[in-house]
Amino acid sequence: MKKTVLRAYARLIAEVGVRVQKGQDVVIEAELDQPEFVTMVADACYHAGARKVTVTWKHQALEKLAIRRESVRTLQTVADWERAKLQHYVDTLPCRIYLLSEDPDGLRGVSPTKMASARQGRYSVIKPYRDQMEGRYQWCIAAVPGAAWAKKVFPHETKSRAVEKLWEAILHTCRVHDDPIAAWDAHNADLQARCDYLNSLGIETLEYRASNGTHLTVGMIPEAQFCGGGEYTIGGSYFNPNLPTEECFISPKRGEAEGIVYSSKPLSYQGQLIEDFSIRFEHGRAVEAHARTNEALLQKLIAMDEGSAYLGECALVPYDSPINQTGILFYNTLFDENACCHLALGMGFIDTIRDYPNRTLEEMRALGVNDSMIHEDFMIGTPDLAITAHCRDGRTVPVFRDGTWAF
């Protein structure tokens, strides 16, 4: 891949993704196999005005080894230096860039119970720091092709060709062409126009139906609004948290989901794939879940904490989105969630609540924004998915028909 194109992508992440402000610190989290591109992103952040760029390196093989060899108690421990680092982030609010390149099957064979216990133990310590940063800093998730991931997506290609093809797909879906920044300005404007229309309807519930058996009704929070593309921090900094993105999303009301929904794509979770699954909801809670593969892992996900069995997001993405048109199954939620409509179990987004900077976290939880240590998207969009809005004034308005926008 030409370095000029990769530099344009790095600039997009720095200037459109996190939109680094002059004098701001940046923290990049990436796998060890991406030093060249991480350097490009760091350089782009400095050019955008960053004061300091720090890189946190990860290595999936070491993560797997630690889960296998360390005790649950050790895995749960948050050391004093980690707490100090979290407090430093609370105090300085750096931009956070997450570059994904992991192998979708990289944690296959490790105990989901042990992983869940470790995460639960750490979360109780980390949550107060996370809550203090909620809505106050820019962050962006983007992707870089790791070799194992590329071979999973393109199994019949050589390793080098698979990586090249995955690069091409990532850059295409992220609109990295002649003028990517202008392209993203136009894309954000289109998503905002769709959100404005949806917000004008006064939606009380969304009803999902598809021929695969999906029939689910989800309640909306009256104070909530659809968001899409870029968003603002409480301090007014505009950023794009996901590159790419094709969604208009909202946080539904906790406790108001009834029916059953069937997945339309595999879910990559903790380095393993959950395939062909369904979840049934009663009074908002997931009460039954089945899967062809990794059913136990799905059930562990749902049981992670009190909020993990409830919905935190409803996202509308047309089945003919540019990502779905590639015909590629990415085995990565960042891309597959933007191929079609999806829901998310777990944490809701406080910034979908109107006037959220002037509300407390407790007030937003009381309105019905779900809280959880997890936020896991799963894809439900199909070519015949119909979504109908039942509005507070009694109107019934088609939102999706035949898998795509009805307006």
Regions found by a protein language model. Name each.
Residues 1-258, 389, 395, 405-407:
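Active-site bordering "gate/hinge" segments
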Residues 11, 199-201, 270-272, 307, ...:
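Short solvent-exposed loop/turn micro-motifs enriched in small/polar/acidic residues
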Residues 250-306:
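Long, well-ordered mid-to-C-terminal structural blocks that present hydrophobic/aromatic surfaces
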Residues 256-258, 274-276, 283, 309-313, ...:
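Active-site lining segments that contact anionic ligands and/or coordinate catalytic metals
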Residues 286-357:
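Dual-mode signal for accessory low-complexity, basic/Gly-rich regions
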Residues 362-407:
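Extended hydrophobic packing segments that form well-structured cores
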